[in-house]
C-alpha cells in the first residue's frame, strides 16, 4: 500500500515551494488589483485597419490629456486594453476622438468600465467578507457533519488549513501572473476563488468521511495507518473526478479560449487541482499530526518529526 502519510513533511515542503515565491512577488509588487477593487477605468478599443499603435504612443496620448497612469496591453484579438485612473464618459469620448485623429484610423469602443475609488474599496471589503463567511461556514458545516466523531471540530479546522493552502497557491499564481502577463484580481477572479473554495471543501469531506467510516470498522488500527488506508481508497475517485472531467475542459479553455477566459480557466485549473492535492497531502496529514499530538515535538529542542 502507498505510504502517503509517511512522506507528509515532503509534501509540506512542496507546498511551501509553491506558495513562498508568489508571496515574495506580492510583497514586492503588491497584489495586482483591477478597477473592480481599487477603482479606475478600463477601455478596450478596436482599430478598423487592424493595425495597432505602439503602447507607448497610446500612453503618450493619455499623458497629453492629463491622464498620467495609463497602462496599455494588446490582446490576441487585435484590440487594445487601456487601464487608467477614473475617467468619465466625456473624457472617454475625448480619448477616442484623439485616437481617431492621431492614428488616422476609425476606433470602435468594445468595452468601457469605470469604477469610483469609494465603490472599489466597498467591493474589496465585501469580497473579503464573503471569503471569511465561507471559511466560517466550512468549520460549522464539517463540525456538524462529523458530530459523531471524537474532536469533530478538528476536521473542520484541518479543512480550513488546507483551504487556506489552496487560496495562497491561487494568490501566489495571480501575483506572479500579474508581473509576467498582466493578470489582475477582478470580479471573475473572485468567482474562480470561491469556486476553488467550494470544490476544495467538497473533496476534503469525501476524504474525511472515509476516515470516519473506517474508524468504525478498524477500531484497533493506528489512526495514521487508518487515515493512510482511507486516502488510498479515495485516491482513484479523486483523480477520476478531477483529471478525467473538469481539468480537461478547463485546459481546453485555457489553450483555446479568449484572453479574458484564459486567466479565469488557468486559475480554476490550478485551484481545483490544488483542492484535490491538499485533501490528500495537507488536510489528512494535518489531522493525523493533530490527533497523534505529533505537533508537540516541533517545539522540543532536537526533536525530529515523526514519520511512518
Curated annotation (Swiss-Prot):
The chain crosses the membrane at residues 10-30, 129-149, 160-180, 181-201, 241-261, 264-284. GO terms for cellular component: plasma membrane. GO terms for molecular function: protein-transporting ATPase activity. Keywords: Cell membrane, Membrane, Protein transport, Translocation, Transmembrane, Transmembrane helix, Transport. It is found in: Cell membrane. It is a multi-pass membrane protein. GO terms for biological process: intracellular protein transmembrane transport; protein targeting; protein transport by the Sec complex. InterPro entries: SecD/SecF_arch_bac, SecD/SecF_bac, SecD/SecF_CS, SecD_SecF_C, SecF_bac. The keyword Secreted does not apply. Pfam families: Sec_GG, SecD_SecF_C. Part of the Sec protein translocase complex. Interacts with the SecYEG preprotein conducting channel. SecDF uses the proton motive force (PMF) to complete protein translocation after the ATP-dependent function of SecA. PANTHER family: PROTEIN TRANSLOCASE SUBUNIT SECF, PROTEIN-EXPORT MEMBRANE PROTEIN SEC. Belongs to the SecD/SecF family. SecF subfamily. Forms a complex with SecD. Part of the essential Sec protein translocation apparatus which comprises SecA, SecYEG and auxiliary proteins SecDF. Other proteins may also be involved. This is Protein translocase subunit SecF.
Amino acid at each position: 500500500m502507498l505510504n502517503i502519510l509517511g512522506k507528509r513533511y515532503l509534501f509540506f515542503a512542496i507546498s511551501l515551494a509553491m506558495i513562498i515565491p508568489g508571496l515574495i512577488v506580492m510583497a514586492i509588487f503588491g497584489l495586482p488589483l483591477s478597477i473592480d477593487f481599487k477603482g479606475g477605468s478600463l477601455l478596450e478599443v478596436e482599430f478598423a485597419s487592424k493595425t495597432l499603435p505602439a503602447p507607448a504612443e497610446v500612453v503618450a496620448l493619455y499623458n497629453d490629456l492629463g491622464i498620467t497612469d495609463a497602462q496599455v496591453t494588446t490582446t490576441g484579438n487585435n484590440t487594445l486594453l487601456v487601464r487608467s485612473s477614473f475617467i468619465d464618459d466625456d473624457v472617454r469620448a475625448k480619448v477616442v476622438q484623439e485616437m481617431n485623429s492621431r492614428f488616422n484610423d476609425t476606433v470602435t469602443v468594445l468595452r468601457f468600465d469605470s469604477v469610483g475609488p469609494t465603490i472599489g474599496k466597498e467591493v474589496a471589503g465585501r469580497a473579503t467578507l464573503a471569503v471569511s463567511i465561507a471559511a466560517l461556514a466550512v468549520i460549522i458545516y464539517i463540525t456538524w457533519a462529523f458530530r459523531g466523531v471524537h474532536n469533530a471540530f478538528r476536521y473542520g479546522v484541518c479543512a480550513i488549513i488546507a483551504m487556506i493552502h489552496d487560496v495562497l497557491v491561487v494568490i501566489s499564481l495571480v501575483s506572479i501572473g500579474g508581473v509576467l502577463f498582466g493578470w489582475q484580481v477582478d470580479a471573475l477572479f473572485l468567482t474562480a476563488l470561491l469556486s476553488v473554495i467550494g470544490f476544495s471543501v467538497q473533496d476534503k469531506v469525501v476524504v474525511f468521511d472515509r476516515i470516519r467510516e473506517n474508524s468504525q470498522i478498524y477500531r484497533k488500527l493506528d489512526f495514521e495507518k487508518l487515515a493512510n488506508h482511507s486516502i488510498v481508497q479515495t485516491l482513484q475517485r479523486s483523480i477520476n473526478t478531477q483529471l478525467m472531467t473538469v481539468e480537461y475542459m478547463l485546459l481546453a479553455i485555457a489553450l483555446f479560449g479568449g484572453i479574458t477566459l484564459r486567466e479565469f480557466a488557468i486559475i480554476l485549473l490550478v485551484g481545483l487541482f490544488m483542492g484535490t492535492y491538499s485533501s490528500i497531502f495537507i488536510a489528512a496529514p494535518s489531522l493525523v499530526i493533530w490527533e497523534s499530538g505529533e505537533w508537540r515535538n516541533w517545539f522540543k529542542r532536537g526533536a525530529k518529526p515523526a514519520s511512518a
